[in-house]
Curated annotation (Swiss-Prot):
Residues 1-25 are annotated as: Disordered. Keywords: DNA damage, DNA repair, DNA replication, Ligase, Magnesium, Manganese, Metal-binding, NAD, Zinc. Its cofactor is Mg(2+); Mn(2+). InterPro entries: BRCT_dom, BRCT_dom_sf, DisA/LigA_HHH, DNA_ligase, DNA_ligase_AS, DNAligase_adenylation, DNAligase_N, NA-bd_OB-fold. This is DNA ligase. CDD domains: BRCT_DNA_ligase_like (cd17748), LIGANc (cd00114). It holds the Pfam family DNA_ligase_ZBD. Zn(2+) binds at C474, C477, C493, C499. NAD(+) binds at D91, A92, D93, F94, D95, S140, L141, E170, R193, E233, K350, K374. Its EC number is 6.5.1.2.
């Protein structure tokens, strides 16, 4: 049975289309076949080409026109089946159309475009996961973990002057956030959320999701807009997740932990055919940037999305009272595992009126007009077998629990974090000895995602069970563990330079998505390079060449008849190619890759924006670092301490000698009109998005700040500016409108 636009992959037929159609096709001796039976009613064709009426046909001599007509019919069939639940052609007719389309594209390759129906499940399309900016930022949502917190959110609305607003309630899908960009009705890009500003391009893989249309279909009430960003969640239904894991286990591969992880993994496959086999679905829950369409209400936008052929939920409700919201939350929670065929972890409540949404605005991370109610995490009892520890890339030693396999929140869990030694002592969880049972513990999936142990079930504790004794030495190198600072809850291995465990983790991290993003340098490769002594540490990574990789068996293949000795494998060559590409990443990624404590993507960007080069960062004092927007004293101290170690400095020097970019390029043709100035932009501008305004400030030498203070030089005020404009007036900071902002950008303060 279809629910919410999703049809299980084991429905009738190859595409799930029942054979009850009246459409037909008749082969023609003199020309091509055009399908004009049921299911072709929405195809626009010239009268001389197609005879109107069920079960008829006509000959089209122009292959481009024939291709266009058949492609539209296939898209129509998918739309009717997956979205309207009203199929009009059967399996055989669908297959004949697809085969004819494939034959046309074989004969005329120029017809094989990325949005052709044959590319949905056909040959692999190149997917390199390049990054692109969202046209409008994808915000997060503030969470509420109790009805009282929802009531507090509602009270804030009323304090802001919003009286008795209509409230839209919808299920919170536990999936992967996605942003679809349609231009003139055509799907041109699909991006993951990423950091909210920039996402990964997964267009080729999203096009294999059968419920996602490649072209939008307009109606009289909802014409197709010139441009629209469609936000939603990609998910893997629970049944499909279980089938996938069964197949992985049968193939001797590791299963996915939960449906969300499997959805994310499926969407990031390099081969779209693998993604196509995973039965992914999507639910749309909003729009971002748009041109040619402006909804009056969130529910109005959802009506438009459905009319355009996009998958929406049938569980959306608009209520007029807070009591109605609480009833929706209670009702959905009682049917949490049956209400839809995919996992949910809460309810999202939104002010329905779009004008009110604009008026309420957003905080730095989330809209004030929406709240996500999270259901209480599921808790189960599990048998604790032992407590193990591992060492991370910064030397932090983390204990984790090993349990009997336990089902919780739809996943089978065997390991759960215990955070640090202090938490083990505080919770007093006790493992057993060899052959002896340990504590029965309360296992919870915090946020329905991360498994954690709340504590022991004391009534079930075996008599005489002793407390866990934490190790005093590193599990990898045997070095005595230390506190970084007095009172630190973490224990760390101070042997940062030589500890094998830290080395492996750091080399692996260098290649991670938030650092250099080097495909082919995973954990197995990091271990292989270190074990073969091809590299001594992460500083040697960019010095790798073919001769070096030949010393690591993982990157070699057996010689052919005319070859002597082991040869570099294709994976080895790809790694070298990817290493070469990675040398040109932005400075913030290089900073993150150094594994400096507290320096993640946010701090890395802040440092790169402020100083522009590695040399400038190394030359800066702790006070100068701390004064940078988004840095502060803790990060500044960590950076200074890191560069005091000669072997750390040598890593940077090695990378620089190998050609890694150590400074961000700045367009010298752009006048530095804002050098030394701090500018805050608040509210909506006509000609600037939030990100483009920030970039305009940074490129002219200014600092784009997020809050108003006495150090702020100018505040740019757009529509629905909010409290920042008020604070600027209180502090006497000059306030500019958009026209004044443009003048400031062009000529600096002197031009005002």
């Amino acid at each position: 049975m279809k629910r919410n636009g999703f049809v299980p992959s084991n429905s009738v037929g190859r595409r799930g289309i029942p054979s009850n159609s009246t459409s037909s096709a008749i082969a023609s001796a003199g020309g091509a076949v055009v399908w004009t039976g049921a299911g072709a009613g929405r195809v626009r064709a010239r009268p001389e080409q197609v005879s109107v009426g069920p079960g008829t046909m006509s000959c089209v001599t122009d292959p481009r026109e024939e291709h266009r007509l058949i492609a539209e019919e296939i898209e129509e069939a998918r739309w009717r089946y997956y979205v309207l639940d009203s199929p009009t052609i059967d399996d055989a007719d669908f297959d004949r159309r697809m085969r004819r389309l494939e034959a046309l594209e074989e004969e005329f390759p120029e017809l094989r475009t990325p949005d052709s129906p044959t590319q949905t499940v056909g040959g692999a399309v190149s997917t390199d996961f390049t990054s692109h900016p969202h046209l409008r930022r994808m915000e997060s949502l503030d969470n509420a973990f109790s009805v009282e917190e929802v009531e507090a959110w509602y009270a804030r609305l009323r304090r802001d002057g919003v009286e008795d607003p209509a409230l839209l309630c919808e299920l919170k899908v536990d999936g992967l956030a996605i942003n679809l960009l349609y231009e003139e009705g055509r799907l041109v890009r699909a991006l993951t959320r990423g950091d909210g500003t920039t996402g990964e391009d997964v267009t080729s893989n999203v096009k294999t999701i059968t419920s996602v249309p490649h072209r939008l279909t307009g109606t009289d009430e909802f014409p197709v807009p010139a441009l629209v960003e469609v936000r939603g969640e990609v998910f893997l239904p629970v049944e499909a997740f279980e089938r996938l894991n069964e197949s992985l286990l049968e193939a001797g591969k590791a299963p996915f932990a939960n449906p969300r992880n499997s959805a994310a993994g499926s969407l990031r496959q390099k081969d779209p055919r693998i993604t196509a086999s995973r039965a992914l679905g999507m639910v749309c829950h909003g729009i971002g940037e748009r041109r040619g369409f402006e909804p009056q209400a969130q529910s109005h936008a959802y009506d438009a999305l459905a009319a355009w052929g996009l998958p929406t939920s049938d569980q959306v409700r608009v209520v007029s009272t807070l009591k109605g919201v609480e009833g929706y939350i209670e009702n959905a929670g009682a049917r949490r595992h049956t209400i839809v065929p995919y996992e949910i972890d809460g309810v999202v409540v939104k002010v329905d009126d779009v004008a009110l949404q604009r008026r309420l605005g957003s905080t730095s991370r989330a809209p004030r007009w929406a709240i996500a109610f999270k259901y209480p995490p599921e808790e189960v009892n599990a048998k604790l077998l032992e407590i193990r520890v591992n060492v991370g890339r910064t030397g932090r030693v983390t204990p984790y629990a090993v349990m009997e396999p336990t089902k919780v929140a739809g996943s089978t869990v065997e390991n759960a974090t215990l955070h640090n030694f202090y938490e083990v002592e505080r919770k007093d969880v006790r493992p057993g000895g060899p052959g002896d049972p340990g504590d029965t513990v309360i296992l919870r999936k915090a946020g329905d995602v991360i498994p954690e142990i709340l504590g022991p079930v004391l009534a079930l504790r075996p008599e005489g069970l002793q407390p866990w004794v934490p190790p005093t030495t590193c599990p990898s190198c045997g070095t005595p563990l230390v506190e970084q600072k007095e009172g630190d809850k973490d224990r760390r291995c101070p042997n940062h330079e030589k500890c094998p465990g830290q080395l492996r983790e750091r080399v692996f991290f260098v290649a991670s998505r938030n650092a250099f993003d080097i495909e082919g340098l995973g954990y197995e490769a990091a271990v292989a390079l270190l074990d073969a002594e091809v590299i001594a540490n992460e500083g040697d990574v960019f010095d790798l060449d073919a001769a070096a990789l030949l010393r690591a068996p993982l990157f070699t293949r057996a010689p052919k008849k005319d070859e002597d000795g082991p040869q570099l494998s294709a994976n080895g060559q790809r790694l070298l190619d990817n290493l070469d590409k990675a040398k040109q990443v932005p400075l913030w990624r290089v900073l993150v890759a150094l594994s400096i404590r507290h320096v993640g993507p946010k701090a890395g960007r802040a440092l790169a924006t402020e100083f522009g080069s590695m040399a400038a960062i190394r030359a800066a004092t702790e006070e100068q670092l701390a004064a940078a927007e988004g840095v502060g004293p803790t990060i500044a101290e960590a950076v200074i301490e890191w560069f005091k170690e000669p072997w750390h400095v040598e890593i940077v020097d090695k990378w620089e000698r190998a050609g890694v970019t150590m400074a961000d390029e700045r367009d010298e043709s752009t006048p530095r009109t804002l050098a030394g100035l701090t500018v805050v932009v608040t509210g909506s501008l006509v000609d600037f998005s939030r990100d483009s305004a920030k970039e305009a400030i940074l490129s002219r030498g200014g600092k784009a700040a997020g809050s108003v203070s006495k150090k702020t030089d100018y505040v740019v005020v757009g529509e629905n500016a909010g409290s920042k404009a008020d604070k600027a007036e209180q502090l006497g900071v000059p306030v500019l409108d958009e026209a004044g902002f443009k003048t400031l950008l062009d000529g600096g303060p002197a031009a005002l």
